[in-house]
Amino acid sequence: MTSFSTSAFRPVAFSLGLLLVMPAAFPAPVTLGEDSKEVAAPNRQLLTSTERIDKHIWYILDGISALRKEICNKSNMCESSKEALAENNLNLPKMAEKDGCFQSGFNEETCLLKITTGLLEFEVYLEYLQNRFESSKEQAGAVQMSTKGLIQSLQRKAKNLSAIATPDPATNASLLTKLQAQDQWLQGVTTHLILRSFKEFLQCSLRALRQM
């Protein structure tokens, strides 16, 4: 299995609590002690929930960009034709008109459910990436853990948590096994497609969340 170095993306030691109160100086990390001091500063304006989520998504996007850069530098996947990439039959989450996230027909609650559900569906693919970046698991793990924190933030905004569909663990386990059994070339294509699709999903989510 080919591994990719991700030295360009320096990992941070995440805890879910820290992720949910990420400071304004993004993406530079701070310790919990430093964060407490900044919040206590007399002239410091606290970030709203929407602003924290906005910065949280940008942080993940920065990590994805660094990982994609490493892949593009070490393989020709980024230059492969769309036809070749399309041969990989992945069912990656994506936005559609019915999801209520586009300007036309925007629906806040429907869109929020789609974003949260989509991120939950991406988790199995992010787990797959942990095995693709064996020499630098911490870097890929930073994106994975930060995404978990983002999901929790969005779940707190949802009015109807029961409407958020959770992927079946057995189905995810089967999918992960199938992805890991691909030949080396297909695994490279899969890695590229996951990062590209996740980036596009987050960008669309970012635009929609700014309207909420």
Curated annotation (Swiss-Prot):
GO terms for molecular function: cytokine activity; growth factor activity; interleukin-6 receptor binding. One of its GO terms (cellular component) is interleukin-6 receptor complex. It holds the Pfam family IL6. InterPro entries: 4_helix_cytokine-like_core, IL-6-like, IL-6/GCSF/MGF, IL6/GCSF/MGF_CS. Its main location: secreted. Component of a hexamer of two molecules each of IL6, IL6R and IL6ST; first binds to IL6R to associate with the signaling subunit IL6ST. Interacts with IL6R (via the N-terminal ectodomain); this interaction may be affected by IL6R-binding with SORL1, hence decreasing IL6 cis signaling. Interacts with SORL1 (via the N-terminal ectodomain); this interaction leads to IL6 internalization and lysosomal degradation. May form a trimeric complex with the soluble SORL1 ectodomain and soluble IL6R receptor; this interaction might stabilize circulating IL6, hence promoting IL6 trans signaling. This is Interleukin-6. It comes from Saimiri sciureus (Common squirrel monkey).
